[in-house]
Amino acid sequence: GKFSGFAKILKSIAKFFKGVGKVRKQFKEASDLDKNQ
């Protein structure tokens, strides 16, 4: 019912933030590499 829809939204938000975290980490590592070169 209502609650499962809410849980789905929470799950997709969590997934989104995980993806953003991964991208930010990769971006930071890439910029660190640029500094080192």
Swiss-Prot record:
Its main location: secreted. One of its GO terms (molecular function) is toxin activity. It comes from the Eukaryota. It comes from Oxyopes takobius (Lynx spider). GO terms for cellular component: extracellular region. The keyword Signal does not apply. This is M-oxotoxin-Ot2b. InterPro entries: Antimicrobial_3 (IPR012522). It holds the Pfam family Antimicrobial_3. Keywords: Antibiotic, Antimicrobial, Cytolysis, Hemolysis, Secreted, Toxin. It is found in: Secreted. Expressed by the venom gland. Disrupts biological membranes, particularly those rich in phosphocholine. Has antimicrobial activity against Gram-negative bacterium E.coli, Gram-positive bacteria B.subtilis and S.aureus, and hemolytic activity against sheep, pig and guinea pig red blood cells. Has insecticidal activity against S.frugiperda ovarian cells by opening non-selective ion channels. Enhances the insecticidal activity of spider venom neurotoxic peptides. Disulfide bonds: none annotated. Belongs to the cationic peptide 02 (oxyopinin-2) family. One of its GO terms (biological process) is defense response to bacterium.
